[in-house]
Every structure is written in C-alpha cells, then in structure tokens.
Swiss-Prot record:
It comes from the Bacteria. Belongs to the purine/pyrimidine phosphoribosyltransferase family. GO terms for biological process: adenine salvage; AMP salvage; purine ribonucleoside salvage. Homodimer. GO terms for cellular component: cytoplasm. It catalyses: AMP + diphosphate = 5-phospho-alpha-D-ribose 1-diphosphate + adenine. The lineage of its organism: Bacteria, Bacillati, Bacillota, Bacillota incertae sedis, Caldicellulosiruptorales. It is found in: Cytoplasm. The keyword Oxidoreductase does not apply. The keyword Ion transport does not apply. This is Adenine phosphoribosyltransferase. Its EC number is 2.4.2.7.
Amino acid sequence: MNLKEKFRHVLNFPKEGIDFIDITTVLQDKDAFKYAIDSLVNLVKDLDFDLIVGPESRGFIFGAPVAYVLNKGLVLVRKKGKLPYKTVSVEYELEYGKDILEMHIDAIQPGQKVVIIDDLLATGGTTLSNIKLVEKLGGKVVGIAYLVELTYLNGRENLKGYDVRSVVQFESSLI
C-alpha cells in the first residue's frame, strides 16, 4: 500500500504558509489505518524496551495499538492540568508562546527503556520535551517512531543521538 497517498494536505492551515498533513483520512480508511499501525509495529519491534510514550493527542492514537500488539505498557504525556495524580512537567516553546507538558510522576521507573510514538515529526521540538520528561524520571529513550516525517523541516537534526524512525517521509511542502 502506498500510505503516502492516503494523507490529505490542507494548505494554509492552521495559518498561512503551512502545509498541514491531515491524518484523519488514514484513520477513517480501515485498511490504511491497519497498515499504519502494522508499519509502526514493524519499525520498533526489534528494539529492547519496556514502555511506549504516547504524546497528546495523536500519539495516543498510534501509541496505544502498538503497545497492545507488542505487549508493552503505555505512558501518556498530557498538557498541563489534564492528569489527575502528581506530575513531572517541562515547559517548551511554541511558535506563539510557551506551553507545559506533564507525565505522572510514577509513570516511568529509573532505568526503564522507552520508545516514543507520535504521528508526525516536524522540527522535533515537542519530542525533545517528551525526552526531557522521560529523562527526568530516570528513563532512557531507546527509539522514537513517527507515522510521518517532514524531512524538509530537518527535525531529525534536532534529535541527533536518538534512534529516529518513520513510516512515511514528505520531502517537500506543497506550498
């Protein structure tokens, strides 16, 4: 299956000059969704790890089924104030300001090996924040897998030293 053809491009969303890669077209196509999950499983099944970290919110969509198939635990990363128990947090920069991501303080034990699974790699900024959360709790990121990588934004460069994998790569924007 050519999964790349299944994504919808929404030009100038959420703002002018952005080529937004819409995953909903993959999710609503049962064969494409299954292929996407199977592909992510194949990307990470050779890694030695304990947990999958799924960042809010699309990381939940892809991280949960991969964790299920590989019989791994799933840790959620949420925006500030969304988790009910004590948390560890990290502040990160957005184009338009700052935000805070959180994880339960007991979600990862020291020495546990983690794979981060998310929908898309753009600049890598959000992933770096997720890495900081994992490392604050003493975990080790042994792999990062994305359904989509926008190679023209060079996010992989910001994640040097980490094992970065992706199912589909877009080499250029449609804008």
